[in-house]
Regions:
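A short SAM/SAH-binding and catalytic strip from SAM-dependent methyltransferases
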Residues: 119-134
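A short acidic, Gly/Pro-enriched loop at the edge of an enzyme's catalytic core
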Residues: 111-120
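Conserved alpha-helix/loop element of class I SAM-dependent methyltransferases that forms part
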Residues: 27-51, 65, 69
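A short glycine-rich, Lys/Arg-flanked "PGG" loop and its adjoining helix->strand segment in the class I
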Residues: 136-151
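Conserved class I S-adenosyl-L-methionine
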Residues: 151-164
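N-terminal, positively charged/glycine-rich alpha-helical extensions of SAM-dependent methyltransferases
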Residues: 1-31
Length: 164
């Protein structure tokens, strides 16, 4: 159910704390991963990846998938929603995924990580909450926390433009 428009610059119109939204995000995550051809469809060799950040991880589906499939990779998920992070932490704990961690963090603000912390920075479908004016700041933060030679992967839906 839609809530009052946010006043913090966030444009997400659905209550991110609702169980229904959490379930929708988990289903969406599975569909995106499957539709893309897997967790890392663009890579044949991930041996150089040791640390991964997932920005706006929601209930943690992609982080949990990576942590389960690649137990030597440390995966960190961040999200602004404490409810989502608590759920993701509980899932990681119940699955024994010590290589998956989750933190409450606002992607619209400077990220609380050291420079060059990650081999891959991933984010998907953040256009739902990102104001146009915040993109350059987020890209700058992604560049800052990505190691030299690392990858920034932004996945968004193509918005159809039509006059019919």
């Amino acid at each position: 159910m839609p809530t009052e428009p946010p006043t913090d610059g966030n444009t997400y119109i659905i209550d991110p704390e609702s169980g229904t939204e959490m379930a929708r995000l988990m289903n969406q995550d599975r569909l995106i991963t499957h539709g893309m051809g897997g967790i890392f469809p663009e890579r044949d060799d991930i041996s150089s990846m040791h640390d991964i950040l997932d920005i706006a991880c929601g209930p943690g589906g992609w982080v949990l998938d990576v942590a389960y499939a690649y137990q030597k990779i440390q995966v960190v998920g961040i999200d602004i929603s404490r409810t989502m992070v608590k759920y993701a932490q509980a899932q990681a704990g119940s699955q024994g995924l010590d290589n998956a961690t989750f933190r409450v963090m606002d992607a619209l603000k400077p990220l609380d990580f050291s420079d060059g912390s990650f081999d891959l920075v991933n984010t998907r479908y953040i256009v739902t909450f990102m104001p146009k004016t915040a993109w350059s700041g987020l890209i700058g933060e992604c560049l800052r926390v990505t190691r030299p030679g690392g990858t920034i992967r932004l996945t968004e839906a193509e918005m159809p433009i039509t006059t019919s």
